[in-house]
A protein has these predicted regions:
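Membrane-embedded catalytic cores of phosphoryl/pyrophosphoryl-handling enzymes
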Residues: 123-127, 131, 138, 164-311
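N-terminal transmembrane-helix/juxtamembrane module of multi-pass inner/ER membrane proteins
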Residues: 1-131, 141-158, 173, 177-189, ...
């Protein structure tokens, strides 16, 4: 009889451990599935950008007017703000701010969020950085789709294209049949003026960081520190867009459209995709004052009961 009890206890322990192991395996599989779905969505969001940047899709071939002064600017060598500086500043500044902000919230304020990732630091960074990168992919895909679909000529197009005007009859007005003598890669790039990628990317990254600071920067010691930081970020984006006009890379309307697109994507990502401004449930504070209970004598209880019965 004793051996049977020992056998039953051992079998119960093995069954319990086996159930816990199976549950852990299912949770691990679910985590990998959710991460895979997120990565797949991120890939789809950035797919148009990846395809267009590899020159798999050529921009629309637009004609021009011989006397169009807006595309006769000289081509400048280099950019005031290069693509590398723009990408590094926009991505690194925002991600570094998110890492510092989320780590501070978890370590000092004990504020976390529920997620399928167990570690609170990894969970917070996975959500916030992932949402930000997803918005980057959306913004850049929108920008490149507009560039190749519209095919607007940059202000320095004629200087880069170098068409042979001896074979062009300018009296016809709009010239659609022409051949460029400049380098093909530069000519194709000169057809991507609308809208400004520098303006849209800088506005998205800086404005998203502005929204992040508005949600997470809760220190009230210096009332003007947060708005000063936010306006500085917006001014950095503003200067980046204006530099594209002075570099003869974009028309002013291209920059304005880029600003609007970047701001719209940043707003949608911050308010509808991330949890930065979602309402959080408040815990009810427990009252420290003890509740006073009225002690009723048994005679009064019987009298009240009889009164209820008669009623």
């Amino acid at each position: 009889m004793q051996r049977c009890l020992i056998y039953e206890k051992s079998m119960a322990g093995e069954t319990k451990n086996g159930g816990a192991s199976a549950s852990g395996w299912k949770e691990h599989s679910r985590t990998k599935l959710l991460v895979g779905v997120d990565l797949f969505c991120l890939f789809l969001a950035g797919l148009p950008f990846l395809v267009i940047e590899t020159s798999a899709v050529q921009p629309y071939r637009r004609g021009f007017y011989c006397h169009d002064e807006s595309i006769k600017y000289p081509a400048k060598n280099g950019d005031t703000i290069s693509d590398g500086v723009l990408s590094a500043a926009g991505i690194l500044i925002t991600i570094l701010s998110i890492v510092i902000g989320e780590s501070y919230r978890i370590y000092f304020l004990n504020e976390g969020s529920k997620s399928f990732v167990g570690n609170p630091y990894i969970s917070a960074l996975y959500k916030q950085v992932g949402v930000f990168v997803f918005g980057c992919a959306i913004s850049q895909s929108f920008t490149d789709i507009a560039k190749v679909s519209v095919g607007r000529l940059r202000p320095h197009f004629l200087d880069v294209c170098k068409p042979d005007f001896t074979t062009i009859n300018c009296s016809l007005g709009y010239i659609a049949d022409y051949q460029c003598q400049g380098p093909e890669s530069r000519v194709q790039e000169a057809r991507k003026s609308f809208f400004s990628g520098h303006a849209s990317f800088s506005m998205y990254t800086m404005l998203y960081l502005v929204f992040y600071l508005q949600s997470r920067f809760t220190w009230h010691g210096a009332r003007l520190l947060r708005p000063l930081t936010q306006f500085t970020l917006v001014m950095m984006s503003f200067y980046t867009g204006l530099s594209r006009v002075s570099d003869h890379k974009h028309h002013p309307t291209d920059v304005l459209a880029g600003f609007l697109q970047g701001a719209l994507v940043a707003y949608c990502i911050a308010f509808f995709v991330s949890d930065l401004f979602k309402a959080k449930g408040r815990r009810c504070a427990l009252s420290s004052t003890p509740v006073k209970k009225e002690l009723v004598p048994p005679a009064d209880i019987r009298e009240r009961s009889n009164h209820l019965i008669m009623a």
